[in-house]
Amino acid sequence: MKRSPLRESLIVLCAGLLGACANDNAISPGGGATTPVPVAQAWMTTADQSRLLSRQPDVPIRSGAEASALVIEVDEGTSYQEMIGFGAAMTDASAYLIQHKLGAQRDAILRELFGRDPGLGLSFMRVPMGASDFSTHDYSYDDMPAGQTDPTLARFSIDEDRPDKLPALRSALAINPKLKLVASPWSLPGWMKTTGSLIKGTMRPEFYGSFAEYFRRFVEGYKAEGVPIFAVTLQNEPAYEPTNYPGMRLDPPARAELIGKHVGPLFGRTGIQALILDWDHNWDLPSSPLAVLADSTARRYVNGIAWHCYAGDVGVQDSVHAEYPAKDTYFTECSGGGWAPVYADNLKFFVGKLIIGSTRGWAKGVALWNLALDENGGPHLGGCGNCRGVITINSVTGVVTRNVEYYALAHASQFVRPGAHHIASTTDVGGLQSVAFKNADDGSKVLIVLNTAPAEVSFAVHFGGRSILYALPAGAVVTLRWS
């Protein structure tokens, strides 16, 4: 159809007026500018992957409480824990792939992961002390020939970490200086253990002092390399002894003695500021960290409890916090993998249990397992042969795939900045799960909502005498942000 100049002018005028409204520069009938219409920004990921952290149309913020059958109340006047952030683990496997397989895109990928606007802003990372199941070989920082010991740690060295792990961490810190690192050993040197090996066993009591010194030297060694350690856990998964990769059992009495009589006092005498976290294992055995906290000497030095996702329910974080509210909570490991191939189920789990559930359960930081793995779920020594990283880096081509864990983290990490506080919000409303935060730097509010219902759900968000109306597809997650 042929358009006349008048029709073209009307189209341009109408488009301009619509654009002005969209940009909150509304025109009053008298020709003057009205008060800008406040809006909330929205980003969505859907269960069918048609939208992946996709920016959605802005949502008008209305005065008063909009009527809706389902209402999420957000109360910024009630605040809980201060957040340090979200992230994953810089394992040997992750560091190797970042350092050797990304090629020219390395810096861009690191900026995407650790930078802000528009990066993910990852700010909480876990670092294995020595080898884990995701290393290329077994090692500790003080290995000795069979039958020999080194109680003074004369041969202690972090040289194993210089080729990959330390450079990768320094690069991340250069991008995000607020990055906090929690370090965990999978095994202490074999000569300290009952098996004489990195595999299985527990600590020999005569080397408890060497155990504490091992931690001190690690923290000071990393600091000298420009990589400060925010916190340590005594042992990864201390109730489990793997058979084909480094591991060690540390029962509650041993952990209580190590913390209360060795690691805690040594850190105090030498001025080490790193926090000491207990447990670093699953939700199914809260009696273990509670037994350590029941020891009055150990309790003086325990700053918090770290949790994993592989058994039990996230609700125990809340119950343990209720018994010891002065002790902080951190979530330090959960991996996806080939055993759970359905994207929608994974999105629901990672957002519902970790991003929402764990932070509602007092977690100040939430870290998933490997930041990066290759297309074969490696490199790895043993244990999980089909784990999935937050990103996959193809070991041949260097092509990066952003997995469901990437988007689950991004819905929080990109918007909830270090220093934010978890604030009150209602949840479990008509299949909707939610958690809310208030950023400290600009006062912006962030609400993350997951729809676990089988159909689209319409709801209202009420806050401070204002409200938002929104409709969320089945299985989708949305992050809403407003001033």
Identify the residue ranges that each predicted region occupies.
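Bacterial signal peptide processing site
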Residues: 22-25
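Bacterial N-terminal signal peptides that target proteins for export
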Residues: 1-10
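Short acidic/His/Gly/Ser-rich catalytic and metal-binding motifs that mark active-site loops
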Residues: 134-138, 189-196, 238-243, 285-288, ...
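Residues that line or immediately flank small-molecule/substrate-binding pockets and catalytic motifs
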Residues: 90, 129, 236, 308-309, ...
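Substrate-binding and catalytic surfaces of secreted/luminal carbohydrate-active proteins
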Residues: 36-74, 181-183, 213-221, 225-230, ...
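Short, well-ordered beta-to-alpha junction loops that form the rim of enzyme active sites
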Residues: 130, 184-186, 234-237, 281
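N-terminal catalytic cores of secreted or lumenal carbohydrate-active enzymes
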Residues: 53-229, 261
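C-terminal motif of bacterial Sec signal peptides marking the signal peptidase cleavage site
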Residues: 17-20
